[in-house]
Amino acid sequence: MNYPNGKPYRKNSAIDGGKKTAAFSNIEYGGRGMSLEKDTEHSNTFYLKSDIAVIHKKPTPVQIVNVNYPKRSKAVINEAYFRTPSTTDYNGVYQGYYIDFEAKETKNKTSFPLNNIHDHQVEHMKNAYQQKGIVFLMIRFKTLDEVYLLPYSKFEVFWKRYKDNIKKSITVDEIRKNGYHIPYQYQPRLDYLKAVDKLILDESEDRV
């Protein structure tokens, strides 16, 4: 299997026993020893088992290029590419609300760069938000070991600034001011739905 640049896909045994996804091809581990993806998956599993919410990670799309059929009943994929996801990382349902969000990590101490967010992802978030979905970015600053929920309604202002070539990133202070801090705890480690509760309350007031 190959990536879009033509380079072959190789398993990384140092990450999750050799498993690796395209959406987190540059997985960064925070001071607490787990990636944002792992923490989010553990939280989602806890929510599901506790009948709190049903939220899942969307599979990374793969484009199959070459298939060999050594036998009629068996197909062997000789060449395939990971495609750029057309939407966000996670979606689901929580207390009757549609939840849709992108999860990102950065090593930067002072800002979150916007160059790894794609136009079609923002367009998807915009469409979901216009349908009254609860849409946001979950951002972890690895070095600071801090996680924030940034609502789409706030993010779109920074995105417009980025597209207008005014500023290529969102500062930590801007995220702290416009987002919701998600503290670590015991179970689940990252209870981001508490921040979602605050977002739902705030947006219900803003949209009236």
Curated annotation (Swiss-Prot):
| Domain of life according to the entry | Bacteria
Query: Where does the chain bind Mg(2+)?
Result: 87, 89, 102, 121
Q: Where is this site: Transition state stabilizer?
A: 104
- Coiled-coil region list: none
Q: Which GO terms describe its molecular function?
A: endonuclease activity; magnesium ion binding; nucleic acid binding
Which of UniProt's keywords are assigned here? Cytoplasm, DNA damage, DNA recombination, DNA repair, Endonuclease, Hydrolase, Magnesium, Metal-binding, Nuclease
Q: Which cofactors go with this protein?
A: Mg(2+)
* Protein known as: Holliday junction resolvase RecU
| Compartments where found | Cytoplasm
InterPro entries to which the protein is assigned, alphabetical: Resolv_RecU (IPR004612), Restrct_endonuc-II-like (IPR011335), tRNA_endonuc-like_dom_sf (IPR011856)
Give Gene Ontology CC terms. Answer: cytoplasm
Q: Which reaction does it catalyse?
A: Endonucleolytic cleavage at a junction such as a reciprocal single-stranded crossover between two homologous DNA duplexes (Holliday junction)
Keyword Cell inner membrane in the entry? The reply is no
* Similarity comment: Belongs to the RecU family.
Q: Give the main EC class.
A: hydrolase
Quote the cofactor binding remark. Answer: Binds 1 Mg(2+) ion per subunit.
Q: What is its EC number?
A: 3.1.21.10
Pfam families per the record?
A: RecU
Q: Name one GO biological process term.
A: DNA recombination
Is the Nuclease keyword given for this protein?
yes
Q: What job does this protein perform? A: Endonuclease that resolves Holliday junction intermediates in genetic recombination. Cleaves mobile four-strand junctions by introducing symmetrical nicks in paired strands. Promotes annealing of linear ssDNA with homologous dsDNA. Required for DNA repair, homologous recombination and chromosome segregation.
